[in-house]
Amino acid sequence: MSKTTIIERIWPAKEIIEDLSELRKQSPLTHVITNIVVTNWTANVLLAIGSSPAMVIAKEEAGEFAKIASGLLINIGTVTSNDAITMKIAAEAAHQAKIPWVLDPVAVGALGFRTELAKELLNFKPTVIRGNASEILALAGTDGGGKGVDSTALSSDALPLAQMLAEKTGAVIAISGEIDYVTNGKETISISGGDPIMTKVTGVGCSLGGVIASFLGVQKDPLRATATASAVFAIAGTRSAKISKGSGSFAVNFLDQLNLLSTEK
């Protein structure tokens, strides 16, 4: 059981509309270091919401660019030894420059190299850690029961340890699942919506990390920014599923629905 009161946030809550409107006005420069499977998709998702993605991955440039971006995503999904160097350089630079950044510890706990890397990256104080229940449980030091990038645990099961992890690291923890939870250890927000078909399109979950990084660039409260990103994803997923025949049409419709979200009151 959660040790805090859980507040639900769904579209079109006032905070969500305000944050999305501000993002579209500012078009924050978002530094994305992600896995090779989802790079193109993530860029398209960020463009659809109104952000400005930049996939700068050379170790010679990553630190310099991280310092001028509005936000940074580091996703370790297909990490290599060279990628790990880039990620540590970028994370350290963002931390030093006080640039908010998101860690997506894909499949952490399942394999040793990425698990050790994720723990090293925690030294650079991520603003937000986003993952499924198994990944969050593994990062918190327990057996998450994951199978690769997939989770066999419920988001609600991971919430108590997510709250402890938030207090330990100082990061906001975002758990993706049938119901998403966002917590800073003291406050917890739940976001319902979306659709199971979202798990049938490669990169949907990973791109959420980029959306969170984008909202961090315009909303200084990381709990609110992360909840807004999750709520935007949920409503776009719900609307897209209703008009899609399968995963292929869903992918296109999802980009459209993100782009078409209205901020008019």
Curated annotation (Swiss-Prot):
Q: Which Gene3D superfamilies match?
A: 3.40.1190.20
Superkingdom assignment: Bacteria
Query: Is Magnesium a UniProt keyword of this protein?
Result: yes
Q: Pathway listed for it? A: Cofactor biosynthesis; thiamine diphosphate biosynthesis; 4-methyl-5-(2-phosphoethyl)-thiazole from 5-(2-hydroxyethyl)-4-methylthiazole: step 1/1
Xref: InterPro entries: Hyethyz_kinase (IPR000417), Ribokinase-like (IPR029056)
Keyword Nucleus assigned to the entry: answer is: no
Keywords of this protein's UniProt record, alphabetized?
ATP-binding, Kinase, Magnesium, Metal-binding, Nucleotide-binding, Thiamine biosynthesis, Transferase
What Pfam families would the database entry show?
Answer: HK (PF02110)
Required cofactors, per record? Mg(2+)
Q: Tell me, which GO biological process terms does this entry list?
A: thiamine biosynthetic process; thiamine diphosphate biosynthetic process
List the GO molecular function terms: ATP binding; hydroxyethylthiazole kinase activity; magnesium ion binding
Q: Which residues does the record give as substrate binding sites? A: 55, 203
Record's catalysed reaction(s): 5-(2-hydroxyethyl)-4-methylthiazole + ATP = 4-methyl-5-(2-phosphooxyethyl)-thiazole + ADP + H(+)
Query: Tell me, what does this protein do in biology?
Result: Catalyzes the phosphorylation of the hydroxyl group of 4-methyl-5-beta-hydroxyethylthiazole (THZ).
> HAMAP family per the record?
Thz_kinase
| Homology family | Belongs to the Thz kinase family.
Name of this protein: Hydroxyethylthiazole kinase
